[in-house]
Amino acid sequence: MLELRHIEKIYNRGTVNEQCIFKDFNLSVNDGDFVSVIGSNGSGKTSLLNIICGSIDIDSGAVLINGDDITHKNEYLRHRSIGRVYQDPSKGTCPSMNIIENMSIADNKGKSYNMRRGINRSRINFYREILRDLNLGLEDKTDIPVGALSGGQRQALSLVMATMNPLKFLILDEHTAALDPKTAETIMKLTDKIVREKGVTTIMVTHNLKYAIEYGNRILMMHEGHVILDKEDVEKASTSIDDILDLFNQISLEYGN
């Protein structure tokens, strides 16, 4: 279980640009949950992910995984058990290296590893089998620099690399936002397949209401650092895009934005 307890985060404290993102923010995510997080710009969605991953520090509160306090644990140590896929496909891969080299680095995350020793040849067939399952033809492009792939191919590779090793959480930071609609659908289907097969607890930030409704067992809507909608299972299944849009419109009227 992931727990965020009494989180406070203020950007630019003591300046004219001071902004309080979270004040006494609390959230629990159960093992195996697939949570879709939606909300307007500036609502705290990405800050939430950054706090979980250790990319930014909090001013007070605690972050716990299965009861262990990881509040002050370095980001690189958290990433041994957390996989993250970003909106920009280039952030999850090394563009100058080929597919096999990228997968080998991901395969050895958290281990003592040196590329000069070469890639374990016994793993190459394993990597190709993973690529073949994607149905994107990448198994025939293993020697091509990743930077030469399409955005969708790179994002699919990023998703595979993020989940190659056993992990506790998968963090998806608007990972389909930069893709065309057809490619985004392909990536979402792949995402759902991987999440189901691995049973990994997943938090997905998205602006696509269709995906937020269609995928996962829980949906959160955030506004100004607060969760204003939290539905799961049957309640989520009965929620429509129109319901979400009505809430967005209500917020716009109440807060004038």
Describe the residue ranges of each PLM region.
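The feature captures the beta-strand-to-loop junction immediately N-terminal to the Walker
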Residues: 38-40
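Helix-to-loop junction immediately C-terminal to a conserved catalytic motif
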Residues: 53
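Conserved ABC transporter NBD signature motif
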Residues: 61-69, 229-231
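ABC ATPase C-loop
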Residues: 162-163
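H-loop/switch region of ABC-family ATPase nucleotide-binding domains
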Residues: 206-207
